[in-house]
C-alpha cells in the first residue's frame, strides 16, 4: 500500500520520455555507461587493464561500424519528413 506500484513507475517513465525525448536519454545512457567502464578500468589491476583495453577497442570499432551502417537510414527518413 505504501510502496510504488509498477503502474506508477510506468507513468513516471512515460513522463520522463515525453519531457526529454529518446535521443537525449540515449546519449545520457551512453555517457553513464562510459563512466561506469572508466570506473571499472580504474579499479582493475594494471595487467588486466591491458587486456580490457584491447577488448574495448574491438567493441568500440564494432559499435561505430554498426552506427555508420544505420546512419544513412535515419538521415533519409529525416529528409522525407
UniProtKB/Swiss-Prot annotation:
A GO MF label: protein transmembrane transporter activity
Subcellular location, record wording: Cell inner membrane
Keyword flag Nucleotide-binding: no
Coiled coil: none
Residue ranges crossing the lipid bilayer per the database entry: 1-21
GO BP annotations, alphabetical order: protein transport by the Tat complex
Chain residue ranges for the region called Disordered: 34-81
InterPro entries linked: TatA/B/E, TatA/E
Keywords carried by this UniProt record: Cell inner membrane, Cell membrane, Membrane, Protein transport, Translocation, Transmembrane, Transmembrane helix, Transport
One cellular component term from this protein's GO annotations in UniProt: TAT protein transport complex
Membrane topology term: Single-pass membrane protein
PANTHER family: SEC-INDEPENDENT PROTEIN TRANSLOCASE PROTEIN TATA
Family: Belongs to the TatA/E family.
Protein function: Part of the twin-arginine translocation (Tat) system that transports large folded proteins containing a characteristic twin-arginine motif in their signal peptide across membranes. TatA could form the protein-conducting channel of the Tat system.
Subunit structure: The Tat system comprises two distinct complexes: a TatABC complex, containing multiple copies of TatA, TatB and TatC subunits, and a separate TatA complex, containing only TatA subunits. Substrates initially bind to the TatABC complex, which probably triggers association of the separate TatA complex to form the active translocon.
Annotated protein name in UniProt: Sec-independent protein translocase protein TatA
Natural source organism: Shewanella frigidimarina (strain NCIMB 400)
Lineage: Bacteria, Pseudomonadati, Pseudomonadota, Gammaproteobacteria, Alteromonadales
Amino acid at each position: 500500500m505504501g510502496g510504488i506500484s509498477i503502474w506508477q513507475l510506468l507513468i513516471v517513465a512515460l513522463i520522463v520520455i515525453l519531457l526529454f525525448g529518446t535521443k537525449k536519454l540515449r546519449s545520457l545512457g551512453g555517457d553513464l555507461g562510459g563512466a561506469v567502464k572508466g570506473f571499472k578500468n580504474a579499479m582493475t589491476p594494471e595487467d588486466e587493464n591491458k587486456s580490457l583495453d584491447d577488448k574495448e577497442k574491438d567493441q568500440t570499432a564494432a559499435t561505430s561500424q554498426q552506427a555508420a551502417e544505420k546512419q544513412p537510414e535515419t538521415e533519409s527518413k529525416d529528409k522525407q519528413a
